[in-house]
Regions:
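Short linear motifs at protein or domain termini
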Residues: 1-91, 95, 101, 133, ...
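A short, amphipathic alpha-helical segment
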Residues: 14, 181-184
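Conserved amphipathic alpha-helical segments that form helical-bundle/coiled-coil interaction surfaces
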Residues: 78, 82, 95-161, 174-182
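Active-site loop of classical SDR/Rossmann-like NAD(P)-dependent oxidoreductases
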Residues: 167-171
Length: 185
């Protein structure tokens, strides 16, 4: 299952891919990764195998590993599943959310709106995640949360692109308020 070094390397590589530090299509050589992350070849190989299973890296015969490109179709497929599961999560939250969680949801919606004014898209993406996290937690379904978190990670690197559009940002503020109202009532 990999030692502490390969697990630490794995999470660093995941983060670097998901935040776009390592770009889609970028070649990943063992030597460069060993040097960059100050580890030996074994943890690099283990991390590459796991990243391939997660769909973040593709192995190309006789060329090595590269950061996976995600097509618009991949993205739409993930979004389609996420929307369906998120609706289930919201339905569950309607009957299971506590007053404290409802207040937390309102604060998260307000925080998203406040963060919008700052113009920092990475922070805005995090504020959006925080809003949805409150719903996931209050739906009180561990398996559903795991799947939703996995889907969220798969599209993380596109979220910042998506948030560049002002119309999209305004739509999300409206959507957050509608979700809050639906759960409250």
């Amino acid at each position: 299952n990999g030692g502490p070094i390969s697990n630490s390397l794995l999470s660093k590589l995941q983060k670097d891919i998901l935040t776009g530090k390592l770009k889609a299509g970028q070649k990943l050589t063992e030597q460069e990764l060993c040097r960059e992350y100050e580890v030996s070849r074994t943890p690099v190989r283990e991390a590459m195998r796991k990243l391939e299973l997660e769909g973040l890296v593709v192995m190309i015969p006789r060329r090595g590993a590269q950061v996976a490109n995600i097509t618009e179709k991949d993205l739409n497929d993930v979004l389609e599943v996420r929307i369906a599961l998120e609706n289930l999560s919201i339905e569950n939250a309607c009957t299971r959310m506590t007053e404290e969680q409802l207040e937390e949801l309102w604060n998260a919606a307000k925080n998203f709106e406040a963060t919008m004014a700052e113009g920092n898209l990475v922070k805005l993406a995090e504020a959006d995640v925080a809003f949805h996290e409150v719903i996931y937690k209050s739906s009180d379904n561990r398996r559903l949360n795991q799947v939703l978190n996995n889907l969220r990670e798969q599209i993380y690197r596109y979220r910042v692109e998506y948030l560049k559009d002002e119309e999209t940002r305004n739509l999300l503020v409206k959507e957050h308020k509608e979700i809050y109202a639906a759960i409250k009532n």
